[in-house]
Amino acid sequence: MNAIWIAVAAVSLLGLAFGAILGYASRRFAVEDDPVVEKIDEILPQSQCGQCGYPGCRPYAEAISCNGEKINRCAPGGEAVMLKIAELLNVEPQPLDGEAQELTPARMVAVIDENNCIGCTKCIQACPVDAIVGATRVMHTVMSDLCTGCNLCVDPCPTHCISLQPVAETPDSWKWDLNTIPVRIIPVEHHA
């Protein structure tokens, strides 16, 4: 019985010692992040699209801060993001890069081919917003109002019955920018 307690104490002391060493090393050898990179990364839209030529927003922010990369290459962010970065870095705003056009991608929604769905629930487990409804061995359905089009449910599906399809724009789904609609105000006295 004493041998068990000695072994437990020895393993506990080893764990405590290694924990203390790791804690010290994490503080002693900590790498400081560049605050300018952090601020640029916060401004970028975080779409991780790669249209700027970098694999994501963070590498593009590092290239802007450290390597002097152009600030006008973010297509999803467009002119608004470029102006914020120019203000942050105190540089002249630049026109959008010819290749980087401000695009508003069509909203995509997952669609399940219910004839091929085997009800495995792998897509339900993968969906981060719980937009898929169904049960084991029962066909599943996507609630299009909740679906963000993130594409995370497509790969886990063993029968490949899930696809992303663009949502048709209707007057109900259109995002109206009321500031750009010309409005003429008619004085009240002319209404009678």
Curated annotation (Swiss-Prot):
Residues reported in the UniProt entry to bind [4Fe-4S] cluster 2? 117, 120, 123, 157
InterPro entries to which the protein is assigned, alphabetical: 4Fe-4S_dom, 4Fe4S_Fe-S-bd, 4Fe4S_Fe_S_CS, 4Fe4S_Ferredoxin_RnfB, Elect_transpt_cplx_RnfB/RsxB, RnfB/RsxB_Proteobac
Instruction: Say where the protein is mainly found.
Output: membrane
Q: GO CC: one term? A: plasma membrane
Enzyme Commission code: 7.-.-.-
Q: 4Fe-4S ferredoxin-type domain spans which residues?
A: 108-137, 138-167
Role noted for this protein: Part of a membrane-bound complex that couples electron transfer with translocation of ions across the membrane. Required to maintain the reduced state of SoxR.
Listed NCBIfam families: PRK05113.1 (NF003475), rnfB (TIGR01944)
The entry sums up its family as follows:
Belongs to the 4Fe4S bacterial-type ferredoxin family. RnfB subfamily.
Name of the protein in question: Ion-translocating oxidoreductase complex subunit B
Q: Which organism is it from?
A: Shigella flexneri
